[in-house]
Amino acid sequence: MGRVPPMSEAYEEFGLLADNAREVGLAWNGRPAVVRREARMRDGRTLSAVVWGSGPPSAVLIHGRSQNAHTWDTVALALLADDANRAFVAVDLPGHGHSQWKDDHDYRAEANAPDVLVAADALAPQARLLVGMSLGGLTSLALLGDAPKRFDRLILVDITPGVNPGKGRAIAEFTSGPERFASFDEILERTLRYNPGRSEASLRRGVLHNAREFPDGSWSWRWDPGRPAVAPGSLAPLWDVLGELTLPLTLVRGSASPVVDDDDVAELVRRRPDAEVVVVEGAGHSIQGDRPLELAELLSARWPTPSARERP
């Protein structure tokens, strides 16, 4: 694999987007409008986000546990290829990506929700669509439990409140590994081992976005490793939130993912008979990485139409 040069020489945050486009066959006409911004939390911390497009953002995308805003990069490029006038925000959850860590290391959905709401109001005040993947989906439910009228549509990506440690065992095994790696090769090798269906090129990009290099050449993940375990049954209140929501709800499920099972889908439909359930064939838990074009197409079909709420 070969050791990469120091990040100061090799890594420019948005310099890898052309590679994203090439890998999935998207035309590359130069870097789109994209910038990193921050929102200040009430306690002085900052929540970081990637803002795509040049108009008022109409959607907020939230990644999963141990990921970051760049997990959406290929999806974002496909969304803009479909409609260059779109604008949206992909946030880094607290303790992830470029967002600051919390002193209490509490990154449960209900703890994340107030921060994400502050960031959404600051960076995407007119956004109407909320898209949450895994922990981001649970955070979305917690947010809507606090502010049920803030968004007009919710799309959950391979997650329900029925998730439990058994369903997420492979994810937990990966994220509970070493906190420091001797080299880039070492951290990349572990990532490849746990993601056998993904290309080395895509995982290399993912590691560059999601890890940092130290002066001695060692690497560590950007996420805060000091996270408490989620107690069994602690997500049950989010089922109640889901059932009480009146906005349109879509669950996008990966056909090869163990995280959402048939019982979860049945419970979701029992509580929300009008909910839409879509299965993406060949996708695992991280549908945005496994089948980004298919996910982008699904999002495009459910994208908010322009309205007075979106005008400057």
State the predicted function of each range:
Residues M1-A59, D83-R86, A124-P125, W303-P312:
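Alpha/beta-hydrolase fold catalytic core
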Residues R42-R45, A87-V131, E297:
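Active-site loop/oxyanion-hole signature of alpha/beta-hydrolase fold enzymes
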Residues V50-H98:
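Conserved HGGG/HGGXW glycine-rich cap/lid loop of the alpha/beta-hydrolase fold
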Residues Q126-P165:
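Conserved hydrolase catalytic core segment
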Residues V157-D185:
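A catalytic-pocket lid/entrance helix-loop region that shapes and gates access to the active site
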Residues A182-A236:
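Conserved alpha/beta-hydrolase catalytic His-Asp/Glu region
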Residues F214-R271, E276-V279:
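Conserved serine/cysteine hydrolase catalytic core
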Residues A283-P292, A296:
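Catalytic histidine-centered segment of alpha/beta-hydrolase-like enzymes
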